[in-house]
Swiss-Prot record:
One of its GO terms (cellular component) is small ribosomal subunit. This is Small ribosomal subunit protein uS4. Belongs to the universal ribosomal protein uS4 family. It comes from Campylobacter jejuni subsp. jejuni serotype O:2 (strain ATCC 700819 / NCTC 11168). Gene3D superfamilies: Ribosomal Protein S4 Delta 41, Chain A, domain 1, RNA-binding S4 domain. Keywords: Ribonucleoprotein, Ribosomal protein, RNA-binding, rRNA-binding. One of its GO terms (biological process) is translation. One of its GO terms (molecular function) is structural constituent of ribosome. Coiled coil: none annotated. The lineage of its organism: Bacteria, Pseudomonadati, Campylobacterota, Epsilonproteobacteria, Campylobacterales. One of the primary rRNA binding proteins, it binds directly to 16S rRNA where it nucleates assembly of the body of the 30S subunit. Part of the 30S ribosomal subunit. Contacts protein S5. The interaction surface between S4 and S5 is involved in control of translational fidelity. Residues 98-163 form the S4 RNA-binding domain.
Length: 208
């Protein structure tokens, strides 16, 4: 399945949670989910009982859409997490968090992961001094992530940094906002990653 490219706020209404897809509108309380907190469609306000499989599938879809990955990418990451020693669900979340586009978002240089992905693909981001234009690039602990010189005054990046003052920066990155760079200091612990996803259902889905 290809990456979803439709109206992103419909996804949030479908799942009933914020997926951080419309950063500034969400912070201002103006997102579609804030205005209409029920699924889209004629019968969206009705809540039916969801099956176990439906619950598992929903959690997988939430994670996919939140991090902006395709089905193929998601399956590959899950397979890698399953091969490693440790909690598969936690390892999956850590692998998703290590994506370059996500790190750019976590450092506050973009209001959404979608915009962070655009910054990466358009060549606005350096990793340890080298330009990297692959959103799925895996960032290792200690890596320096920097906005290229000519883009440091980009108004959208500046606005994102201003909004970060409202939400704060996650504990596993150190950021020099004025200089437009940050260090990915370590992999996050699961309890530090505040996302509306219950990864145990994803593990159950792929373990069938």
């Amino acid at each position: 399945m290809a990456r979803y490219r439709g109206p992103v706020e419909k996804l949030e209404r479908r799942f009933g949670v914020s997926l951080a897809l419309k950063g500034e509108r969400r912070l201002a309380g103006k997102s579609a989910l804030d205005k209409r907190p029920y699924a889209p469609g004629q019968h969206g306000a009705r809540k039916g009982k969801i099956s176990e499989y439906g619950l598992q599938l929903r959690e997988k879809q939430k994670a996919k859409f939140m991090y902006g990955v395709s089905e193929k990418q998601f399956r590959r990451l899950f397979a890698e997490a399953a091969r490693r020693e440790g909690n598969t669900g936690v390892l999956l979340i850590q692998l998703l968090e290590q994506r370059l586009d996500n790190i750019v978002y976590r450092m506050g240089f973009a209001t959404t992961r979608r915009f962070a992905r655009q910054l990466v693909t358009h060549g606005h981001v350096l990793v340890n001094g080298k330009r990297v234009d692959i959103p799925s690039f895996r960032v290792e602990a200690g890596a320096k992530i920097e906005i290229i010189e000519k883009s440091k005054n980009n108004p959208q990046i500046t606005r994102a940094i201003e909004l970060t003052a409202q939400t704060g920066i996650v504990a596993w990155v150190d950021v020099e906002k004025d200089k437009r760079f940050g260090i990915f200091t370590r992999k996050p612990e699961r309890e530090e990653v505040v996302i509306p996803v219950e990864e145990r259902f994803i593990v159950e889905l792929y373990s069938k």
